[in-house]
């Protein structure tokens, strides 16, 4: 029976989460997941949220605001999945701000400069509402902020391109407040192969990537294996001397053939390593039906481009996508689907090794029916 269909296991899970307060266990489940699954009242949800420390390890706010500087996430702004009022309503204590570097920037140059801009942007968000928000660089900061009634914004880099082949940049970004680095993103880079890139340049990690891991270990920056090819993920687990994380991934067991997700053996290995797997909320990450829909859309767009000799920036592609989506409604996942991924990590690696990495503001309009925003 699926984890989400076993209330007694869910209750034990909640009780265990309430008792855990160690450094790695600040990576807890959101109240909305637990309380909705248990059909608790709104007041019960709020009470639970106040009793535990809730952390989401991956939210793509900075790049959204960078592209649309008119957005102010310290006030209500429903153009995206995240803003401060909804963060407070959901009881989220700490939201890792993703310093996302697109692969196109990596190829064109300027990755480090963009990372600096995005980090400064996060500091700018905090400066707008210092009585409500604070930058966090360690677990103690998050606990202190919680007691003071402040929401925490720790930071992680998504795509290691800003390292730019220079190990000195590891300490540089640590001083800037970065506490994890996702080694690659949608394409292989100078550090690692990507799960999305069919051209595997390195057979896993590059030689520089194998040097980078110990440097990150020494600086106290967590190594994030989300987005990596299988070979790269296994090599990280072999090389790293400290626990690794998957900041926003899900399980391949439920979506066979989707290499962006983790295998059961990887989950077990992360647990043995002492790390944490944070579950991504995107529907196409958590159900095979949604992934099939996405694959079919990609194939249809590719065929349409080739038939009409269009490039990737042609505006007619947007119209084609919208029309196709109207004719083929997207099969949104539900809360229970996300819970099943969480439950399987518990079964495979133990309760100490599961968390959430929602990917809010990063997976577009594919969020599950019951998890549409951070509230």
Language model regions located:
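Bacterial N-terminal signal peptides that target proteins for export
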Residues: 8-10, 16-27
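Bacterial N-terminal signal peptides
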Residues: 26-36
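Distinct, well-ordered alpha-helical segments
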Residues: 166-170, 232-242
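Short hydrophobic/aromatic-enriched beta-strand-loop microsegments
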Residues: 243-249
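Substrate-binding cleft of carbohydrate-active enzyme catalytic domains
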Residues: 214-225, 229-235, 266-272, 344
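Active-site glycine-rich loop that binds ribose-phosphate moieties when present
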Residues: 203-211
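N-terminal hydrophobic targeting/anchoring segments and the immediately downstream early-domain regions
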Residues: 41-202, 252, 256-375
């Amino acid at each position: 029976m699926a984890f989400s269909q076993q209330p007694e296991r869910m209750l034990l899970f909640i009780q265990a989460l309430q008792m855990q307060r160690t450094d790695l266990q600040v990576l807890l489940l959101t109240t909305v997941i637990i309380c909705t699954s248990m059909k608790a009242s709104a007041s019960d949800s709020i009470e639970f949220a106040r009793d535990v420390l809730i952390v989401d390890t991956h939210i793509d706010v900075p790049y959204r605001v960078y592209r649309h500087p008119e957005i102010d996430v310290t006030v209500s702004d429903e153009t995206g999945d995240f803003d401060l009022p909804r963060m407070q309503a959901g009881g989220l204590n700490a939201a890792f701000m993703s310093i996302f570097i697109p692969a196109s920037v990596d190829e064109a140059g300027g990755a480090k400069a963009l990372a600096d801009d995005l980090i400064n942007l996060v500091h700018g968000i905090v400066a707008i509402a210092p009585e409500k928000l604070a930058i966090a660089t360690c677990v103690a900061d998050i606990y202190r902020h919680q007691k003071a009634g402040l929401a925490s914004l720790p930071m992680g880099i998504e795509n290691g391109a800003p390292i730019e082949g220079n190990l000195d940049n590891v300490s540089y970004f640590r001083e800037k407040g970065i506490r994890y680095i996702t080694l690659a993103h949608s394409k292989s880079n100078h550090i690692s192969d990507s799960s999305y890139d069919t051209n595997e340049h390195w057979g896993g990690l590059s030689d520089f990537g194998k040097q980078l891991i110990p440097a990150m270990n020494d600086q106290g920056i967590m190594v994030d294996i989300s987005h990596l090819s299988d070979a790269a993920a296994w090599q990280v687990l072999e090389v790293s001397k400290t626990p690794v994380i998957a900041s926003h991934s899900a399980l391949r067991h439920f979506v066979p053939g989707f290499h962006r997700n983790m295998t059961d053996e990887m989950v077990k290995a992360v647990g043995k390593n002492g790390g944490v797997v944070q579950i991504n909320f995107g529907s196409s990450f958590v159900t095979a039906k949604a992934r099939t829909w996405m694959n079919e859309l990609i194939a249809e767009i590719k065929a349409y481009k080739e038939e009409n000799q269009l490039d990737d920036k042609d505006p007619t592609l947007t119209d084609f996508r919208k029309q196709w989506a109207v004719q083929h409604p997207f099969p949104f996942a539900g809360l229970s689907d996300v819970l099943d991924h969480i439950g399987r990590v518990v079964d495979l690696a133990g309760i100490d090794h599961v968390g959430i990495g929602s990917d809010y503001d990063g997976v577009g309009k594919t969020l599950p029916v019951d998890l549409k925003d951070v509230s």
